[in-house]
Amino acid sequence: DALAAHPHVVHTDAIGDPDTLMSELGQPGMHPEGWFYPDTYHFPKGTTDVEFLRRANAIMRERLAAEWAEREEGLPLETPYEALILASIVEKESAVASERPMIAAVFVSRLRKGMRLQTDPTVIYGMGESFDGNIRKSDLRRDTPYNTYTRGGLPPTPIALPSGESIHAVMHPAKTDALYFVSRGDGSHHFSATYEEHREAVIRYLLGGKADRYQGGN
């Protein structure tokens, strides 16, 4: 939206069609989500939107390739694109930047164990324009390609533009036994290694200490 509204950018028809845009960028057939490095860019007046996005795309591809080449051994990720997808989830889950390696570690451990990721941002992305700001139990049960409660593994595409920090966190997750996390309500999270500990954290942070309100879930 910011790019489309910028007065010094020359707008082209390619920007309105994802297939045409990605072909222009040398990635035909690729979904555009996640492929543009988020940063502050300086560019001359008269730059076309495709030229601008080509630059952001090239930086993302370079950063992703560099991080992939230096990744930790044994990650449950087959391709750089899978790492990009997971990094986009970490980006959406991490309001506190220092928690990114921990959040990445939880998801990496879940993938290793064959557990579903069960992360709300993917569900919200899959809901598209039907999301009204509230996510309900029925939304978590409604199957879409992006619902990581109903489907195992990663969603089919990134769900956001991951920062360099989130990409690095996925390639170098924290050393932890944590398999769960829950919001403390201040942007940070409580991490748990066991379901019982996670249940207690949910009751404490989300349910005001009222155990009778707990309905399960991961």
Regions found by a protein language model. Give the residues of each.
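Bacterial extracytoplasmic/cell-wall-associated proteins, especially those involved in peptidoglycan
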Residues: 5-12, 20-218
